[in-house]
């Protein structure tokens, strides 16, 4: 036999789960902020580097592993070849990361770095973050991608 306290506890739990589900579904269909910058070139957060991303083709495909070129230069325009670069990212509105673990696999020279293992498994607003450590210092770049 259920007591009034256990019935209230069940009702609270069901209400909390329903509210969480409703909020999650609202996030899935929410639009990105209007001021999102989708450009493929930018200055790092601390101003130490300028960078550009170049996907393999004209468009960024969904559901396929990709290779990108990350071009890095100092704020003064000198190519950055000897950099340690960490790659991360995800979907801000969905609260999850990338489905793969992309990484910079080698320096190509003249400031270019090969990024392998990038994959986007659904349409929407994604961010790709690069944390760069080189002679000029450590700094971060964030690129917005829309599929």
Residue ranges and their predicted role:
Residues 25-147:
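Intrinsically disordered, low-complexity terminal tails/loops enriched in metal-binding residues
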């Amino acid at each position: 036999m259920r007591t009034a306290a256990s019935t209230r506890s069940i009702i609270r739990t069901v209400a909390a789960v329903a509210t969480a589900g409703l909020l999650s579904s609202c996030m899935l269909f929410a639009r990105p902020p209007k001021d999102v910058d989708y450009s493929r070139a930018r200055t790092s957060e601390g101003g130490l580097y300028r960078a550009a991303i170049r996907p393999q083709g004209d468009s960024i495909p969904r559901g396929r592993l990709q290779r990108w070129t990350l071009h890095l230069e100092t704020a003064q325009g000198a190519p950055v070849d000897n950099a340690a670069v960490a790659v991360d990212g995800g979907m801000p509105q969905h609260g999850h990361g990338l489905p793969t673990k992309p990484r910079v696999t080698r320096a190509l020279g003249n400031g270019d770095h090969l990024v392998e293992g990038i994959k986007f498994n659904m349409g929407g607003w994604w961010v790709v973050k690069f944390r760069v450590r080189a002679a000029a210092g450590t700094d971060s770049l964030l690129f917005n991608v829309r599929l």
